[in-house]
Amino acid sequence: MERALLILKPDAVQRGLIGAIISRFEQRGLKFQGLKLMQVDEALARRHYAEHEGKSFFEGLVKYITSAPVVVAVVAGKPGTVELVRTMVGATNPAKAAPGTIRGDFGVDIGRNLIHASDSPESGERETAIFFQPHELIGDWNRTLDGWIYE
C-alpha cells in the first residue's frame, strides 16, 4: 500500500477542524494506519522541514509548527494515494485552492494553510519514519467495506 503523512497544523487544531478534515480522507476510502495528537518540538520540526532550510520562510515555519499541538496521521491506499491526497488537500495557497479541497473550503492564508501532506510516495515513507515508530502503526488491516471501495 502507498502511504502519505498528514499533519493537521496548529491552525486546523485551534479552529476545531480535526474531525471535518479527517472525515474527508475516511469518506474517500483511505485507511488510517496511525493517528496522534502531539506537540512538535524544534528539533523534530527542523528534521521534518530540512529540505527548506536556508529559505526565507524556514524559521517562521519552524516557529509556527511548534506553536501549538498538531495531529499527525498516516493514510494508506492503493498506488496513487499520495497524488489523491494532494488533490484533496488543494493548492498551497488557499486563495488559489479549488473549492471542494480542504484548503479551498477551510483555508484563508498561505501562512495558515491547515495541512501538510507528503508530496511523493518516497516522502510519505520518509516522513512517516520521522513521526511514527513502527509499533505505532497498524499495517494492512481489513475493513468490511474495502470490497465496496476497491476492485
Swiss-Prot record:
Spell out the subcellular localization from the entry.
Answer: Cytoplasm
Query: SUPFAM superfamilies given for it?
Result: Nucleoside diphosphate kinase, NDK (SSF54919)
The reply on keyword Phosphoprotein is yes
- One Pfam family of this protein, by short name? NDK
The top EC class, named as a word, is transferase
Q: Name one GO cellular component term.
A: cytoplasm
Q: Does the keyword Kinase apply?
A: yes
The protein's superkingdom reads Bacteria
Q: Which Gene3D superfamilies does its entry note?
A: Nucleoside diphosphate kinase-like domain (3.30.70.141)
Which cofactors does it use? Mg(2+)
Keywords linked to the UniProt accession: ATP-binding, Cytoplasm, Kinase, Magnesium, Metal-binding, Nucleotide metabolism, Nucleotide-binding, Phosphoprotein, Transferase
UniProt-listed Enzyme Commission number(s): 2.7.4.6
Q: Which family does it belong to?
A: Belongs to the NDK family.
HAMAP family xref list? NDP_kinase
Q: In its UniProt entry, what is this protein called? A: Nucleoside diphosphate kinase
Per the UniProt record, the source organism is Chloroflexus aggregans (strain MD-66 / DSM 9485)
Taxonomy-wise, where does this protein's organism fall, top ranks first?
Bacteria, Bacillati, Chloroflexota, Chloroflexia, Chloroflexales
